[in-house]
Amino acid sequence: MAAQEDRLDSFGMQHGILLSSSPSLQPPYNHQEYAWDFQRYLNKLQSLRPSDSESFRTEINLLLDQLISQDYTPGVTGIGQEEVCAILVQACRLVQHNQEHLVSKVCQLVHYLLNRLQVIVDEQNLDFLLAFSISALKQCSSWTHADVLHALAALVYNNGSKCQKYLNELLGPTGILVNLCDPSQPDPELWREAIHCMANLCLGVPGHPYLDEPYRMTCFKNFLTVLQTPKPNIVDDIAVCTLLQNALKGIQSLLNGSKIKLLETGQLGSLLAVLKKYMFHGLPGLSIEMPTVLYPTPLAQYDGRSPTKPEQPEAAVNQPTWSKKKRKAGKQKKGHQGEESKEELKNEIGAEINKDLEKMKLCSGEAQHSLYLGPQKSPLDPHQGQVGKDHFSPQVQRYKKINSSDSEYSDAEGSLQNKIRSFQAKVRQGALSCFLSTIKSIEKKVLYGYWSAFVPDISGIGSPQSVSLMTIALKDSSPKTRACALQVLSAILDGSKQFLSVADDASDHKRAFTPLSVTLASSIRELHRCLLLAIVAESSAQTLTQIIKCLANLVSNAPYHRLKPGLLTRVWNQIKPYIRNKDVNVRVSSLTLLGAIVSAQVSLPEVQLLLQQPLYSLSQNSGSATPSDPESNRKESMLEGGKKNGLHSEHSQSCWLIRLCITLVVEPREDSYSDSEPSSTPAVMYEPSPVRLEALQVLACLVKGCFNMAQSYLIELGEVACKCMQETDASIQLHGAKLLEELGTGIVQQQKPDSIVPINLMVPINQAVTFWNMILNGPLPAALQNEQHPTLQTSACDALSSVLPEAFSNLPNDRQILCITLLLGLNHSENPLVKAAAARALGVYILFPCLRQDVMFVADTANAILMCLSDRSPNVRAKAAWSLGNLTDSLIVNMEAMGQSFQEEFSDMLLLKMLWAATEASKDKDKVKSNAVRALGNLLHFLQPYHIVKPRFCESIECAIQALVSTVLGDGTMKVKWNACYALGNVFKNTALPLGKATWTAAAYNALTTVVKACKNFKVRIKSAMALSIPFSREQYGSTEQYCDIWNALVTALQKSEDTEDFLEFKYSASLREQICQALIHLLSLASQEDLPRIRKTLLEKGDSIRNYVLHYVKSEVQGDESQREHQDRGKMLQRAIEHIRGFEELPGSNKGLIEVAYFEAILVSCDKEMEAL
């Protein structure tokens, strides 16, 4: 040990950083020896007592040096949290604050052990160590403070929630860290370390309380001050970078850990300004001056740049003369045409890259200093690591010059420069990460006010290109920084569909100003141009993946139907070659991008044409670089083979993308990529699982959005789904089931009554039967019974529910029974997802014509649904309520089609159970309630007189109607209220119910009249007015007072039909007035003599306003023959109501020439005159 101690004496510390000897000079220690030594040092420390003697100082100084000199590694047995805390606490107990040299050494030990061994101090020991450190800052000389702050930063790391006791001393108005963070601080090192401590304090730990608001704002202001300081008083560039990094990390922690109110404090513009500034920190050739605050505006932000020298004219000499090579192409012999055309393609793309890079220059002289991405790998020739010599742009040639061995500075200087560039890149990454957290902490509508500050736009004539996130993506030398910028851009684009929907450049109308729609359109075009350029220029596979993902996000949100066509074609043609890239993630993201195009824009003619491109175009140039390698040739031969051997030859509307995805999913690989991911099985080499999964998702998108094209591959896609469901990979099985569901749904959608697909272009019923026979004789039944994979069972249930009803009825009897048996069995599953899916599937099957008239199936389904309605899972109850609504719909259809025979055959006890279950469900959550009230309306409509007279039904009827009334008047969603009003209308249709006489009549009418007058949602008002017009006899409206209340409520509702706070509701006001007028005329046609005085009073008081609305309703301002017919129908309704009122004139004691008759006859006369004039 003596020799070891002598060696350790040579170690020293400077500014809290251990300057140790090389590890090669130290003897190899095993972990056990380190643990023994550590325990021995602890025992020595525990044997000492605090003293001020020279011998004590010497001994403890030696012990501390020995501890600091050890090369500890995390995870060593015997050196854990308990041992480290024990040795630190003991060392602090022994050292007194007047022993400043030892205080510094102890702090170095704290920092070293906590960082080296990655230990988080427990709360009790933390309390002691914090007290020691804070006292040291108060009592010791300033030369020790740097080491103390080092220790403090290590102590508070991830311990902010445990430091509440000391926060006021550290972060209060006169706190130690606050005072040290003053930019005028004479020692900039202390400023840097204080910011470091603050940043570590701000780190949030999930599940623990965060800093209080005052402390958060104190930290935020200090971090912002650091970032706003023009040039910190620190000579060392690396130290400046660490200061900036800590400030950025601190703000990021504040944004991630708490909802800091940037808008309320007015700090958002200031924060965004400094973030934009440091996104470009140290980027060669760029010196940007930012305003202190960015303001939200659709216009370009102020962008100050340092003046630069004009570019030397000889730079143009380096431009390759592509046109000469093009002219030479025609002189080549025929045998060399293939290679020459390929060379032409390279030249064209190189020229485009050069042209675009020139546009991206920030200033004329920056190219001389630009460390651009460097020589990039061309997708044209995967066997080359870089573009050919003649194809370098001037920027790349300069890059080669700067990085050559002829550099003007020495190796040591170069190493330092590289280190500085590395730290500057970390600052840029920190600014981008902080910006990403800022985006997540503010509303998108606020963020889009700053769109022009961060998203590129096409520059005006003569003006330079403004800096943006794409500047970093194209010009930063660090792949990680480029990826960060693209991540931020993706976050901005995510959810931007509504904001970008106003973009429009399809019409070339010249204006005196540039509207927002044109500005956004040009921004979208510039984004496409820059991202496509970045794809060609990128050399890092990881960053390339991020570019393609960002492009997919843009495609998902851009309104291409309002933009000039061609953008998607360029994206499509440029991304196709990357489907065969050697990197798995690049291939996956390329498929994701194609899927985004298909999902979001499939209806565009441009996309339809792209999907119908011939297969051979995949290997030809389509305006972008196209790789050519053995793997691509293999895929093309497989595609052609599939075309010749499969069903593809019969396809009237072929789609190369479907063929490609089928190939990627099911065809084995003949040779392997250099992928990091292993193959699926050792025997058969398939594409890596992520590629196959993405290909399946693209197939599902194609089937969903472009079924008219996919239906040509129906049987083949069914085979693909079956093959996937038979594999061992659970994810592949699941996506196979989802593809199957989309295929089934596509067939069903085609056959709907409102489908616009011509009958001759629909999938024939016999083909649908063949398809489902194949599926049911395949892996679907096994998937439904796979209890080890409940997610697959769920998807299989959803797939089974997508059977076409007409196809189901034509399936063999045993297959039908199999489907029903499996679904009824899965209804008892213990997994809520499976149970919910089975309940929903039964709700679909109950509407099948061949099943809904089967009383036994209806009864079995009802019992299964009733069981699910009492499940603990809200999702299961919601699906069960939906299915119950469908089941009761089928009861009404059967009642109308089969008459009383079906009602008598259906079990009274089961009907009563359903009534009670629906009543209880109407008190559940809104998702359950909306369908429960729908079921109640149907059940009350279904009841017959012999049901109603039974005592056990009387109570249930009254409770059910009370539940509907409560729902109408309750605070549920508008969908719930709408369904409840609809349900009450259904109740009124049942003539067997004692409407008008029962005690619940008044409550039902009161609920509807309340809603028709005051509900904010006009659709609910319309449905309530419709319900009020359903009763067909005067007796059903109850007493004269009840009748007149309904009449007055409708008149009031008519007058308020244009009163709304929500502009979106205004479009329904015309429909509302029509429905109210119809209800008023219906009431008038049923009025009794006792009702007339109230009606007359209303007409005298509000007659003028009512007249205009009724006149408009009857004449129906629609042109053409249809308006004549509609006018005649409505006119007849009013005429019948007038005749009904006129009948009272002949009664004894009645007034002749009733006001009501004259009033409405005048309306009819006015209508007739106006219609005759049409």
Curated annotation (Swiss-Prot):
Q: Which cysteines are joined by disulfide bonds?
A: none
User: What keywords appear on the UniProt entry?
Assistant: Repeat
Intervals holding HEAT repeats: 168-207, 460-498, 523-560, 566-603
State the organism of origin.
Xenopus laevis
Protein name (record) = HEAT repeat-containing protein 6
**Basic and acidic residues bias: where?**
336-346, 631-648
Residue stretches in coiled coil: none
**Biased amino acid composition, Basic residues:** 323-335
InterPro entries the UniProt entry points to: ARM-like (IPR011989), ARM-type_fold (IPR016024), DUF4042 (IPR025283), HEAT6 (IPR052107)
Please give the residue ranges the record annotates as the region Disordered.
304-346, 373-392, 619-648
Tell me which Gene3D superfamilies the record gives: Leucine-rich Repeat Variant (1.25.10.10)
